């Protein structure tokens, strides 16, 4: 069963109110509860809907493979700075095992409804190499993990290693999910790359 989303017919100007609502279901095999943050933009809402639909359908497949009641729920964070919105989604899925499985995704857009990517904020194409170096240095500085090889692996210059981010006056905030740079018990690891280290690297983005 697909998620039912109600979309507001509005222009692509940030005038319509955004709102959050909940979609949930419970059966003998599974329970899911999805908190949905709806933006004023149909294209952004569709992107969110398609991703949530896909992950929910994947989760439901497990009802045929185990004898436990599976669980699926979501959370999100919204950050805004200079007319840019960073909507970070987190899916917690339990289908057996020691703990929940975490899936995350980010939807970045401006106040005109244009969807943005991390590369849009940087002047040069080698920005991932720069982020790899700077994030590794910050993680070492805060003592995120004594295993330096783990840190290096989790900060390799690959886009998936920098999927949760937002900019503000302090600089670039990065979140590394559990297991990426440290054990599960450490939880998400958050760092800030100061603006002073990015001043010659980032470019203005239309908001």
Where are these regions (language model features)?
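Sec-dependent N-terminal signal peptides
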Residues: 4-15
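Compositionally biased intrinsically disordered regions enriched in Thr/Gly
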Residues: 18-106, 110-207
């Amino acid at each position: 069963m697909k998620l039912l989303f109600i979309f507001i017919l509005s222009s692509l100007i940030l005038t319509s109110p955004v709102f959050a609502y909940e979609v949930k279901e419970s059966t003998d095999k599974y329970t899911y509860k999805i908190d949905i943050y709806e933006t004023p933009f149909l294209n952004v809402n569709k992107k969110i809907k398609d991703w949530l639909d896909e992950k929910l359908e994947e989760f439901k497949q497990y009802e045929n493979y185990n004898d436990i009641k599976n669980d699926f729920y979501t959370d999100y964070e919204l950050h805004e700075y200079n007319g840019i919105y960073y909507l970070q989604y987190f899916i917690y899925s339990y289908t057996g095992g020691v703990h929940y499985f975490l899936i995350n995704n980010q939807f970045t857009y401006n106040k005109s409804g244009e969807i943005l990517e991390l590369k849009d904020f940087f002047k040069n194409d080698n920005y991932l190499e720069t982020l790899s170096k700077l994030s590794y240095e910050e993680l070492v500085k805060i003592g995120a993990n004594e295993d330096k090889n783990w840190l290096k692996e989790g900060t390799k210059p690959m886009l998936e290693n920098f999927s949760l981010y937002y900019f503000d006056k302090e600089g670039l905030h990065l979140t590394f999910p559990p297991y990426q740079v440290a054990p599960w018990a450490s939880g998400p690891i958050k760092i800030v790359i100061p603006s002073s280290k990015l001043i010659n690297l980032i470019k203005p983005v239309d908001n």
